[in-house]
């Protein structure tokens, strides 16, 4: 597979970053292949730069592990830091919050089933779409939204190839 880390894993973070922070203005990326037995990149990072000064960074490496008993929880870990607090999502599904000035993290409980791939995210996505088709429930995602994710994925690969920061043109 020519495109690996960003195509298989990073695209989900593109989606999450867009959901949480909106559309990036520019991006930069540095990708590399560490394992010579595969065709695509397996390590690297990309940064989304936002008009308001916010930065969102993905730093991934398919050769490293993270804290999870279930190795099918392959999405890694995430840390969000801001002026109103910090959120941490760990590889085992633990979600924590810390307010500014506090030293202790508070656990956020939420419904999470540690079964099948990625906490059963594929099943839940398929159920969501079937519910929309059968019951006319609203979709939380659209083809147009996902196509924008794929456009940003392509820009990430272009940025890594050209070693340049690229504009994320918005229609």
Regions found by a protein language model. Name each.
Residues 39, 51, 128-171:
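C-terminal helix-rich "cap/oligomerization" subdomain common to oxidoreductases
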């Amino acid at each position: 597979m020519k495109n690996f880390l960003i195509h298989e894993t990073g695209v989900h973070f593109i989606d999450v970053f867009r959901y949480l922070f909106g559309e990036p203005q520019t991006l930069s990326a540095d990708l590399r292949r560490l394992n010579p037995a595969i065709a695509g990149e397996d390590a690297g990072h990309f940064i989304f730069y936002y008009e308001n000064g916010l930065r969102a960074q993905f730093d991934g490496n398919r050769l490293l592990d993270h804290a999870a008993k279930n190795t099918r929880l392959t999405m890694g870990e995430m840390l969000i830091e801001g002026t109103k607090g910090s959120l941490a999502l760990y590889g085992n599904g633990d979600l924590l919050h810390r307010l500014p000035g506090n030293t202790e993290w508070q656990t956020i409980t939420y419904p999470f089933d540690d079964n099948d791939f990625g906490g059963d995210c594929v099943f839940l996505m398929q159920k969501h779409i079937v519910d929309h088709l059968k019951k006319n429930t609203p979709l939380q995602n659209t083809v147009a939204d996902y196509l924008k994710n794929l456009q940003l994925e392509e820009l990430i690969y272009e940025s890594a190839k050209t070693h340049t920061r690229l504009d994320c043109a918005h229609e």
